[in-house]
Amino acid sequence: MSDNYKPRSLIEIVNDVLSTVRDYYDSEYVYYIEKEQDDIETIYEWCAENVPWQRDRLKMLPSENQPKWMKQEITDTTSDSYSVFQQLDEDTTAVLAAVGVHRGGCEIALMRAVLPYIPQAIALQKMQKQQEYLSYHDDLTGLLNRNSFVDYLDHVKEKELKSLGALSIDINGLKN
C-alpha cells in the first residue's frame, strides 16, 4: 500500500454504495436497514438533493405503519419503490431499498449484488473496533492494560506532568 492510502470509514463506504444505488435508479431515497423482527436496529439513508432526510422518522414508526417496501421484497420494476432482503441470522434481516424511483424498468440485479457486502463491512468494522478495544483493555475486567499505559507515556508531555502513578496488580490464576 502506498503511504498516501488512507482507509475510509464505514460511513463513507456505505454512503458511496447508497449514493451509487440512488443514482442508478434515480430514486429519492435509498436505505440500508437491519431489522430484528419489526424493530429497526441499523439504518443508513442516502437521498437526492433537496429531499429531506426521513431516517429518524422511519426508525420511530410502529411496525403497523412501516411502508410496504420495509415489510416485503418489492422486485416489480414498474413500482415506485424496490426492495431486496437478505436473512442475516435467525431474527435479523437486511433490507436494501430504493424509494421514490423515477427511472422505472431497471433491473434489481445491482441491489441484489450489493446487499451482501454492506452487512459484511459493518461486521468487519465491529470486529476491528473490538480488536482495538481489546488491545488497550483487559478482556476480563475491562480495565486499561499495559499497552494503554505505554501509549499514554508515548503521548504525554513530560513538562506538563506534575505527578504520574501506575498501579499494577497481578493475581495468579485470576483468569483461569
Predicted regions and their residues:
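Nucleotide second-messenger and two-component phosphorelay signaling modules
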Residues: S135, D154-G165, I169
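Amphipathic alpha-helical "output/dimerization" segments
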Residues: R103-A123
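Helix-loop-beta substructure at the N-terminus of cytosolic sensory domains
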Residues: D3-C47
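Generic recognition of well-ordered alpha-helical segments
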Residues: S19, A113-P116, D151
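GAF sensory domains
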Residues: E28-A97, V101-C106
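A conserved signal-transducing helical linker
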Residues: M1-N15, Q125-D138
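Conserved nucleotide-binding and Mg2+-coordinating catalytic segments in signaling enzymes
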Residues: K129-D151, I169-N176
